[in-house]
Amino acid sequence: MLWKIRKEEITLSSYIYRIDLPSLSQTIQEYPNFNFNCLSKAQIQSKEWLIRQLYECVGLSGKKIAMLGGWYGLLAQPLYELCPDITYIRSFDIDPDCANIAESLNKSLLHDNWKFKATTYSVNNLNWKEKVKYHTQKTDGSYQFMSDRFDIIINTSCEHMPDTWVRNVSSEQVIVAQTNDFDIPEHTNRCDSPDLLIEKLGIKTILYKGRLNTEQYTRSMVIGYK
C-alpha cells in the first residue's frame, strides 16, 4: 500500500493540489528510482503557489502549456482540475527517467487524447516562438512527430539550467519562472530574489513577482512577458 511505503513524504495540503493516488502507488512500485522529493512539503507548496497565481494573472481556459524541466509532471493534474478545458500540457525534461514516470502519474490525461504528454528533450534546443517541432516516444516505443504551439511557458527548474531557453520565447508568450536559493551542487543557476530573476530572464511586463519561504529554502517566482 502507498501509505505504508512513504506516508510521511506525502502532503496533500489543500483542495487545489490533487494527486491520482492509485496511479502514484502503481508508479512507485513500477519505478524503483522514483524520487520522493517530488512530494516534499516545499515542492507541493511551490506548485500550489504557482497554480493560484497563474490562474489569477492570466487564466487557463483554452491555454496550451509547456513545462520546461517538467520532472514528473505533477503540475498537470491540479491545473486540469482547476480548469478542465486547458487545450494540452506538454512536459520536457532532459532526464530520460522522467518521461515514463510523468506519463505513469498522469495516465488518465495521457490516455485522454494526449491532454498530457512528456518528452525527453533539452529545452535549450527548442524554439518556443513558433510551432515547436520535436519527436516524442509513444507507449509502443515508436516515435511520433509533433508540432505544438504554446501560450504559457512554465519553468520551475531555473536553478538547474542556464537561461538560454528564454531567448527562444516570444514577447507574446506568458513566462512563469521559479527558482530558489538552495545551495547544492546541482543548482548551478541559483537566484535569491524575484528581482534578480526578472533581470536574468529579461522580463519587461511583470504580472506577478514574489517569494515563498519554505522550511528548506526561499523560492522566487515571476509571471510576465519579455
Stretch-by-stretch model annotation:
Residues 1-62, 100-150:
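S-adenosyl-L-methionine
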Residues 60-73:
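Conserved class I S-adenosyl-L-methionine
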Residues 64, 88, 151-152:
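Structural motif
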Residues 72-86:
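Conserved SAM-binding loop of SAM-dependent methyltransferases across substrates and taxa
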Residues 86-92:
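Short beta-strand element of Class I
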Residues 94-97:
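Conserved SAM/SAH-binding beta-strand->alpha-helix loop
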Residues 162-226:
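C-terminal substrate-binding/active-site "lid" region of AdoMet-derived donor-dependent transferases
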